[in-house]
Swiss-Prot record:
Key residues/motif important for the effector activities are degenerated in most NLPs, including the nlp24 peptide consisting of the conserved region I (11-aa immunogenic part) and conserved region II (the heptapeptide GHRHDWE motif) that is important for phytotoxic activity. InterPro entries: NPP1. Keywords: Glycoprotein, Secreted, Signal, Virulence. Residues 23-42, 51-96 are annotated as: Disordered. Residues 55-65 have a biased composition (Polar residues). It comes from the Eukaryota. A motif (Conserved undecapeptide motif I) lies at residues 185-195. The gene is NLP7. Glycans are attached at residue 60. Residues 73-96 have a biased composition (Pro residues). Secreted effector that contributes moderately to virulence during infection by P.capsici. Does not cause visible reaction of C.annuum for several days after inoculation, but by 7 days after inoculation, small necrotic lesions become visible. Leads only to chlorotic areas, without necrosis at 7 days after non-host N.benthamiana leaves infection. GO terms for cellular component: extracellular region. It is found in: Secreted. This is NLP effector protein 7.
Length: 318
């Protein structure tokens, strides 16, 4: 029964819908001569709205300055202070060992050039540099080179001046000075390849020196107080020196042998020659080592460390 009622209701509904459709079609044909107004949409088409969307005006925005970091006003943290790295302790200078003498021909030894004086003592030494007159025997020669090579000297044969009439390289006078009991002493020394009054007499090598004693090297006009030339391990003394034995500020000495006695220095009135002066503290290190180490046979270097003070004490003229 229920099924029958449902079917009847469905048929009635379909009949009603068909009648409405027929009526609508008839009205459409009657009104075809007049334009059909476009119905107003009740709903918004979202797709069309998105395509025609007016862009929103961007408001002018004032960018506020960035707030300053308050930490920037604080003083910067100082860099840490580190202690300096200590320099490594230099290795000790190795002991060069004993000096080995390096001999060379006497006429091949080159002298030191005389330096310009700088110190008070150097200026005084140049000012009072003596002159030497060779009466007989050898002329003075350089004894040591810058490298520490030393003169081999000459045998005692031939005439007193045989083979030693002067070096082609030039000669040399060696100086050293100091205070002795309130007096300034300047020692000037010469080297000779041999000391031979005649053939077969004397010995290889010779050193002679004169000491000039002055009051004070550091005053405008120092005065010569005494002169002590060397003679056979001793000294002759002039206190004060004779005016005839001094040329300005240069004392005059002669190198002479009174046969058969060996050569020695004496004060003289005869003029002589001067040589380039090199002071002890101006010698090279090797030259100093050589002068302090080399033995010269029967001759003695008077200004080396082992002899200098003893010679001054012995020559004291006052």
């Amino acid at each position: 029964m229920r099924l029958f009622a449902f079917l009847w209701s469905s048929v009635a509904f379909l009949s009603t819908v068909q009648a409405q459709v027929s009526q609508t079609a008839s009205q459409t044909q009657d009104d075809s001569s007049t334009p059909t107004p476009t119905p107003t949409d009740k709903y918004v088409n979202i797709a069309d709205a998105l395509r025609t969307k007016t862009p929103m005006a961007t408001p002018n925005r004032t960018i506020m300055p960035t707030r300053q970091d308050p930490r920037a006003t604080e003083p910067p943290t100082p860099e840490p202070t580190y202690l300096p790295t200590p320099s490594p302790t230099p290795a000790p200078t190795p002991d060069p060992g004993p000096w080995v003498a390096k001999w060379m021909d006497h006429d091949q030894v080159q002298p030191f050039k005389q330096p310009d004086p700088v110190t008070v003592s150097e200026k005084a030494a140049v000012k009072f540099k003596p002159q030497i007159h060779i009466t007989n025997g050898c002329h003075p020669y350089p004894a040591v080179t810058w490298w520490g090579e030393t003169s081999g000297g000459l045998k005692t044969k031939g005439a007193p001046s045989a083979g030693c009439k002067g070096s082609g390289w030039g000669s040399q006078v060696y100086g050293r000075s100091t205070w002795v009991k309130g007096v300034w002493a300047i020692m000037y020394s010469w080297y000779f390849p041999k000391d031979s009054p005649s053939t077969g007499l004397g010995h290889r090598h010779d050193w002679e020196h004169v000491i000039v004693w002055i009051d004070n090297p550091d005053i405008e006009n120092p005065k010569i107080l005494a002169v002590t030339p060397s003679a056979h391990s001793g000294y002759s003394k002039q206190v004060p020196p004779s005016a005839d034995c001094v040329d300005g500020t240069s004392v005059k000495v002669k190198y002479e042998s009174k046969w058969p006695i060996n050569h020695a220095l004496e004060s003289t009135t005869e003029g002589g020659e001067t040589q380039d002066l090199i002071m002890w503290n101006q010698l090279s290190e090797n030259a100093l080592r050589a002068m302090n180490s080399v033995t010269w046979g029967d001759a003695n270097c008077p200004f080396c460390d082992g002899n200098f003070q003893a010679k001054l004490d012995k020559a004291w003229p006052f």
